Amino acid sequence: MIVRTTDEITGTERDVAGPGWRSKRIVLGGDGVGFSFHETTIDAGTTHEFHYVHHIEAVWLVEGEGTLTDLDNDQVYDLRPGTMYLLNGHEKHRVQARTTMRMMCVFNPPVTGQEVHDENGVYPLVAVPAS
């Protein structure tokens, strides 16, 4: 059994931030459970483009409001607490935060914690070390 709090993750290597966002990576590939689980915060007034070509991501919005745009077909979705979106087709997408948004995110395959978005918003596929 694994039990963690966001307080114990804050300020560690599992607490990752970039311009306009912060991700507390609660479960990572090294935990050996087949997925990773993150609490991600996106700052109000920011826009981010992502394209997870190697991962499927599920996102559950728990706080804030914004929009999600599927960049393959320009369809726009409103985001508010209680909204879930699943990028099961590896869709290139844009997230715009009207207010600060807090989301719970699941990645499969799991991220290791070492990934950094490249210039196209892509995480590389990083092998999970054998434990």
From Swiss-Prot:
Pfam family, one: Ectoine_synth
Enzyme Commission designation: 4.2.1.108
Keyword Lyase: yes
Reactions accelerated catalytically: (2S)-4-acetamido-2-aminobutanoate = L-ectoine + H2O
GO molecular function, one term: ectoine synthase activity
Alphabetically ordered keywords of this record: Lyase
Superkingdom of origin organism: Bacteria
GO biological process: ectoine biosynthetic process
Pathway stated in the Swiss-Prot or TrEMBL entry: Amine and polyamine biosynthesis; ectoine biosynthesis; L-ectoine from L-aspartate 4-semialdehyde: step 3/3
SUPFAM superfamilies: RmlC-like cupins
Known role: Catalyzes the circularization of gamma-N-acetyl-alpha,gamma-diaminobutyric acid (ADABA) to ectoine (1,4,5,6-tetrahydro-2-methyl-4-pyrimidine carboxylic acid), which is an excellent osmoprotectant.
Entry similarity comment: Belongs to the ectoine synthase family.
Name this polypeptide is given: L-ectoine synthase
